[in-house]
Amino acid sequence: MEKFTVLEGVAAPLKLVNVDTDMIIPKQYLKTIKRTGLGTGLFSEMRYKDDGSDNPDFVLNQSAYKNAKILVAGDNFGCGSSREHAPWALLDFGIRCVISTSFADIFYNNCFKNGILPVVVSKEDLDKLFDDADRGANATLTIDLPAQEIRGPDGGVVKFEIDPFRKRCLIEGLDDIGLTLEKAPAIAAYETAKGAEQPWL
């Protein structure tokens, strides 16, 4: 998993509440178990017209936001059915951080497992970040995970909280496999000792 320390980039404003996982990645894209290639399906029902062409009104199709690394979204982001394809699609598009006032629990947990930082802020701070994001490529946000702060283009700072364990995993790039491998010496020692005690196993 790619490490997350300090991220600087354009933030796209998605001023919608209750964005569910079917809106993030519709069901027709769930046939694959590959994590790559899902970026094209991200928000596809809003992003594309019926004929498959880009919807110019959708934020991620606008030139200022096509390379966005940060998504500033409305309340209750990631609600709906459980599908890990949702963070996969965001990551494949290039989104490494989502900022909102609240997230659905399963989506929130899945973000951490896939190297995406979900940041919870107050409504007041979200409105400020929406204002920053509205400026597009003329203003970038800096997400400083070690310092637990979001720095705006005009020097404003928004602090955020994060579980220390999840913070360490993101900074060190540790997913579930990486965490298990940290225990590899202890696992190997146990297997050796167990084999000596019970060689018939």
From Swiss-Prot:
Species the sequence originates in: Xanthobacter autotrophicus (strain ATCC BAA-1158 / Py2)
Keywords for this protein: Amino-acid biosynthesis, Branched-chain amino acid biosynthesis, Leucine biosynthesis, Lyase
GO molecular function: 3-isopropylmalate dehydratase activity
Reaction(s) catalysed by this chain's protein: (2R,3S)-3-isopropylmalate = (2S)-2-isopropylmalate
Name of the encoding gene: leuD
Pathway stated in the Swiss-Prot or TrEMBL entry: Amino-acid biosynthesis; L-leucine biosynthesis; L-leucine from 3-methyl-2-oxobutanoate: step 2/4
Pfam families linked: Aconitase_C
Gene Ontology CC terms, in alphabetical order: 3-isopropylmalate dehydratase complex
Top EC class of this enzyme: lyase
Subunit architecture: Heterodimer of LeuC and LeuD.
Family statement drawn from the similarity comment of this UniProt entry: Belongs to the LeuD family. LeuD type 1 subfamily.
InterPro entries membership: 3-IsopropMal_deHydase_ssu, Aconitase/3IPM_dehydase_swvl, AconitaseA/IPMdHydase_ssu_swvl, IPMI_Swivel, LeuD
PANTHER family hit by this protein: 3-ISOPROPYLMALATE DEHYDRATASE SMALL SUBUNIT, 3-ISOPROPYLMALATE DEHYDRATASE SMALL SUBUNIT 2-RELATED-RELATED
Protein name, entry field: 3-isopropylmalate dehydratase small subunit
Function field: Catalyzes the isomerization between 2-isopropylmalate and 3-isopropylmalate, via the formation of 2-isopropylmaleate.
Cross-referenced HAMAP family: LeuD_type1 (MF_01031)
Amino-acid biosynthesis is among the record's keywords: yes
